Swiss-Prot record:
<dbReference type="GO" id="GO:0006412">
    <property type="term" value="P:translation"/>
</dbReference>
<keyword id="KW-0689">Ribosomal protein</keyword>
<keyword id="KW-0699">rRNA-binding</keyword>
<protein>
    <recommendedName>
        <fullName>Small ribosomal subunit protein bS20</fullName>
    </recommendedName>
</protein>
<dbReference type="InterPro" id="IPR036510">
    <property type="entry name" value="Ribosomal_bS20_sf"/>
</dbReference>
<comment type="function">
    <text>Binds directly to 16S ribosomal RNA.</text>
</comment>
<keyword id="KW-0687">Ribonucleoprotein</keyword>
<comment type="similarity">
    <text>Belongs to the bacterial ribosomal protein bS20 family.</text>
</comment>
<dbReference type="GO" id="GO:0005829">
    <property type="term" value="C:cytosol"/>
</dbReference>
<keyword id="KW-0694">RNA-binding</keyword>
<feature type="region of interest" description="Disordered">
    <location>
        <begin position="1"/>
        <end position="25"/>
    </location>
</feature>
<dbReference type="GO" id="GO:0070181">
    <property type="term" value="F:small ribosomal subunit rRNA binding"/>
</dbReference>
<dbReference type="GO" id="GO:0015935">
    <property type="term" value="C:small ribosomal subunit"/>
</dbReference>
<dbReference type="InterPro" id="IPR002583">
    <property type="entry name" value="Ribosomal_bS20"/>
</dbReference>
<dbReference type="Pfam" id="PF01649">
    <property type="entry name" value="Ribosomal_S20p"/>
</dbReference>
<dbReference type="GO" id="GO:0003735">
    <property type="term" value="F:structural constituent of ribosome"/>
</dbReference>
Length: 86
């Protein structure tokens, strides 16, 4: 445990950020999983809706700094490729 006052605050701040980032990443994984399930089922309408939702989640995660913008772009590209194969 830190003895310095500013470091104690950083520990609390980092913990709050970690929980927030964890929540965003979890929601992101859920959105991607729901798209993949719709795509595997062959439901094009539902897959299109979930692709849009997953893309929005990826963009938000990238803008918040939870994931790198290039990672978001790569994942969106892979999801779009999977959608176009339907």
């Amino acid at each position: 445990m830190a003895n310095i006052k500013s470091q104690m605050k950083r520990i609390r701040t980092n913990e709050a950020a970690r929980k927030r980032n964890q929540s965003v990443k979890s929601a992101l994984r859920t959105a991607i999983r729901s798209f993949r399930e719709a795509a595997e089922a062959g439901d094009k309408d539902k897959a299109a809706e979930r692709l849009q939702f997953a893309s929005r989640k990826l963009d938000k995660a990238a803008s918040k700094g939870v994931i790198h913008p290039n990672q978001a772009a790569n994942k969106k590209s892979a999801l779009a490729l999977a959608f176009n194969k339907l």
